[in-house]
Amino acid sequence: MSDPSCSACSGTWPDSNHFIADLGLSMAYLHDDQFFPGWTVVVFKRHATELFHLAPTERIQMMEEVSRFANMLAETFDARKMNYGLLGNQVPHIHWHLIPRLSNDPAPLEPVWCVPHDPVTLSEEAIQATIA
């Protein structure tokens, strides 16, 4: 199932240049804003807006994919904590934000959405180096 009005289904979000990996039921992309290094978005391939729209087996597999990828991010970025976000208010399509929180985190007790900052956009070379 696909929704042509959905930016995730139509391929306009996330940026395909930020593709990291096909995880099975989902795909991982480096988030556009790297103020929090390693911020990744794991996007469910099929259109669904709520976890309860998924079959139980899909929910289990999706959580396994998110968990495995979060573990890899935590190890790669030496995260002291991982943050997980599943909101869907701006992009109504199931996608998880995986945000490594590092030892030099500018606001370790705050949700990332509450930290005022200028977005950090990486060059194409830096994107490729990060996702390699």
Each model region followed by its residue ranges:
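HIT superfamily nucleotide-processing domains
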Residues: 1-132
